[in-house]
């Protein structure tokens, strides 16, 4: 069964880009030197600034991410969940634009839809129709685009409350690797889970405004008690990030995280016994011109609500 509908591009990007902040590394890379490999070295701090700070090389490209999620302890999610997000982003002369096609495999069905950020608009695309998001919600969605000056990729990630530079704990450079024909610098770090779950809480509010939480069964909010329980539940988080050696643009991230809450925390978090997340993100065609096309057929926000109501019933 295929249901054409919108799903949370924000949660997809959040989970994938956390990969850039995961701990752990793999052998086989050429060492960058003892100094560069030290945690919190001047070299790695500079690399973080160059990757997520002003960088006119990060003005366009394509994002492709896949997340596999395995939940235990909740019958509603007894089958593995897979989320994918694919789409271009562009500086567009100083006004960041993006289009993400999102697909979610959930309980034997597939949900799919598009999200557009173009000009002053934010839209949701279902099939050949684009639905305008009302100004109050769209303005909040676009507000982070004012940050990350000179880094379009960073601006787009900021829309989804993604800030790896805030989450990195004891970052270090572990080597070099060639990714899709590009020489990259391989970095790793631990995760500041307090900062991570604060951003997750902000993201939940945005998802609720778009009714994503109602449709998917995600929590409408992540309060302080839940954030603390999540922090305590992280058993392992390993990840790797690869940044272009010459242009310092993020090229690839990999992430593997396991949460196993205690019996007490399970009651706070809804009852799951474990969640395993494996994610991969690739950024390609960096610097290549990208065109963001929004369907000419437009639908009203009220019409979108009818479609979302039908979707919510279909996935119960």
Task: For every predicted segment, state its role.
Residues 1-10:
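Bacterial N-terminal signal peptides that target proteins for export
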Residues 17-20:
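C-terminal motif of bacterial Sec signal peptides marking the signal peptidase cleavage site
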Residues 22-316:
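Subset-of-secretome marker
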């Amino acid at each position: 069964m295929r249901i054409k509908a919108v799903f949370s591009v924000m949660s997809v990007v959040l989970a994938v880009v956390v990969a850039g902040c995961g701990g752990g590394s793999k052998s086989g890379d050429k060492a960058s030197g003892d100094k560069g490999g030290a945690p919190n070295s001047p070299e790695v701090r500079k690399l973080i600034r160059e990757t997520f700070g002003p960088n006119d090389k990060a003005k366009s490209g394509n994002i492709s991410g896949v997340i596999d999620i395995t939940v235990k302890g909740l019958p509603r999610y007894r089958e593995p969940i897979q989320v994918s997000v694919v789409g271009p982003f562009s500086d567009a002369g100083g006004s960041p634009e993006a289009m993400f096609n999102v697909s979610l495999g959930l309980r034997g069905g597939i949900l799919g839809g598009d999200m557009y950020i173009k000009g002053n608009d934010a839209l949701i695309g279902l099939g050949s129709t684009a639905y305008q998001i009302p100004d109050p919600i769209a303005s909040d969605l676009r507000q982070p685009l004012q940050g990350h000056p000179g880094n379009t990729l960073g601006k787009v990630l900021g829309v989804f409350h993604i800030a790896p530079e805030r989450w990195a704990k004891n970052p270090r450079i572990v080597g070099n690797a060639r990714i899709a024909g590009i020489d990259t610098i391989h970095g790793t770090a631990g995760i500041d889970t307090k900062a991570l779950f604060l951003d997750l809480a902000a993201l939940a509010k945005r998802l609720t405004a778009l009714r994503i939480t109602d449709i998917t069964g995600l929590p409408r909010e992540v309060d302080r008690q839940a954030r603390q329980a999540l922090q305590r539940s992280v058993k392992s988080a390993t990840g790797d990030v690869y940044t272009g050696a010459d242009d310092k643009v993020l090229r690839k991230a990999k992430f593997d995280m396991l949460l196993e809450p205690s019996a007490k925390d399970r009651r706070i978090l809804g009852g799951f016994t474990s969640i395993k997340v494996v994610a991969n993100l690739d950024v390609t065609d960096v610097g290549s011109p990208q065109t963001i096309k929004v369907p000419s057929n437009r639908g009203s926000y009220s019409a979108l609500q009818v479609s979302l109501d039908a979707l919510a019933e279909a996935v119960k």
